């Protein structure tokens, strides 16, 4: 992973809490969207790949990733963004912490190994019109493998954090309408 994408400096941040309310002492910044070429590292994949009608995409504005659009369940009903495959440094990491503002809808965090089309995902909920930023802690062990929406099982589909090459976000909550997820940063722990 390039220095622009992954800063190896470790910091302390009292605003990030574990579920048991203890501080996360150290973390590694994976994305903070301040790089000049941050948008070139992401791609959009919407349900139009299967004939759907959802619209979605992303912009980097004021050093934040904004994933927005509108889902249409008359078709696939999803929109997603993810990083292009690259060498992410998740070896010896347990998961990620994401600082975001949402819209009350449920999103999915997505991780992929190599150039695989198998996605490992987990849902996270957002508050509608939040005044403050939210954080969510996602343990890699909580991600479930799937391929084109079908659940997969077996050892060959287990997630190996050291082999994660792409991360992203998806909205597929079986609801029509506009969506917007603002991401301030993504950090690994």
Residue ranges with predicted function:
Residues 1-4:
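Bacterial N-terminal signal peptides
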Residues 7-189:
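Beta-rich carbohydrate-recognition modules and glycan-binding surfaces
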């Amino acid at each position: 992973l390039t220095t622009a994408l992954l800063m190896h400096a470790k910091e302390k941040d009292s605003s990030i809490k574990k579920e048991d309310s203890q501080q996360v002492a150290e973390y590694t910044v994976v994305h903070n969207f301040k790089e000049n070429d941050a948008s070139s590292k992401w791609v959009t994949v919407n349900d139009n790949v299967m004939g759907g009608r959802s619209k979605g995409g992303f912009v980097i504005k004021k050093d934040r990733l904004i994933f927005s659009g509108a889902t249409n369940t008359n078709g696939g009903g999803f929109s997603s963004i993810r990083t292009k495959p690259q060498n992410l440094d998740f070896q010896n990491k347990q998961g990620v912490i994401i600082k975001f503002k949402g819209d009350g809808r449920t999103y999915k965090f997505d991780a992929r190994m190599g150039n695989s089309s198998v996605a490992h995902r987990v849902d996270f909920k957002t508050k509608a019109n939040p005044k403050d930023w939210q954080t969510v802690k996602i343990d890699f062990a909580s991600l479930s493998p799937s391929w084109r929406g079908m659940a997969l099982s077996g050892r060959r589909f287990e997630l190996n954090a050291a082999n994660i090459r792409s991360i992203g976000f998806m909205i597929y909550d079986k609801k029509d309408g506009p969506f917007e997820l603002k991401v301030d940063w993504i950090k690994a722990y």
